[in-house]
Amino acid sequence: MIKTKICGLTEVGQALATARTGADFAGVVFAESKRRITTEKALEIAEALKPLNPRPMLVGVFANQTAEEVNRIASVCRLDRVQLSGNESWEYCNQVNLPVIKVIHVAESTTAELVIQEIQAGLKALKKTPVFLLDTHTKALFGGSGQSFDWQIVKQVSLKYPVMVAGGLNPENIQGFIKIAKPWGIDVASGVETDGIKDTAKIHLFIERVKDADGNRIC
């Protein structure tokens, strides 16, 4: 089954709605972003999700912050995983206590071979195997831009390595994306928002369409 992550949650109600869909990961942002939340709010979300069984893993999103800050917030907010969306080195990743989701930024000039080389370098350098997340490179934002990149890159990389993908995905295009790219996982933020706020109806529709497309795949 394709893994799913709803990212940029800012309220407990959004997190509970995400959990009800059966999503695998719920993301809260601590990096500079319009979706950034306080540690207090993140802890509220963690405590609301904790009694649920099953429940989505709570992922904290960071970008170019110190490893000490990342580990402190992860502990205080009872995170399950840490997503590193900046330009963090592999050495830096090894300093993070929790399992890591490492973003690989895909620019217009990026090829599938370059992505594969970066994944191979990470696997060689890291003490623990991370989840690799391919996301669109933008100058201003570390994710959540709503901009997509060449899906053929995902298709080629997925033949060799399991990857999660973000960037421009929404309920309207997700089934076409899955058919072409066949990713291990999918991450969405702006694609399930209305006027910049998480839309629970869109979250449900998105996950429903992922499950439907995944069930119709011929592996």
UniProtKB/Swiss-Prot annotation:
What one GO molecular function would you report for this record?
Answer: phosphoribosylanthranilate isomerase activity
Tree of life domain: Bacteria
Q: What is its EC number?
A: 5.3.1.24
For this chain's UniProt record, which GO biological process terms are given?
L-tryptophan biosynthetic process
Q: Which reaction does it catalyse?
A: N-(5-phospho-beta-D-ribosyl)anthranilate = 1-(2-carboxyphenylamino)-1-deoxy-D-ribulose 5-phosphate
Q: What Gene3D superfamilies does the database record attribute to this sequence?
A: Aldolase class I
Q: In which pathway does it act?
A: Amino-acid biosynthesis; L-tryptophan biosynthesis; L-tryptophan from chorismate: step 3/5
List the keywords (alphabetical). Answer: Amino-acid biosynthesis, Aromatic amino acid biosynthesis, Isomerase, Tryptophan biosynthesis
Family as reported in the entry's similarity comment: Belongs to the TrpF family.
What is the recorded name of this protein? N-(5'-phosphoribosyl)anthranilate isomerase
Classification from the root reads:
Bacteria, Bacillati, Chloroflexota, Dehalococcoidia, Dehalococcoidales
Identify the coding gene.
Answer: trpF
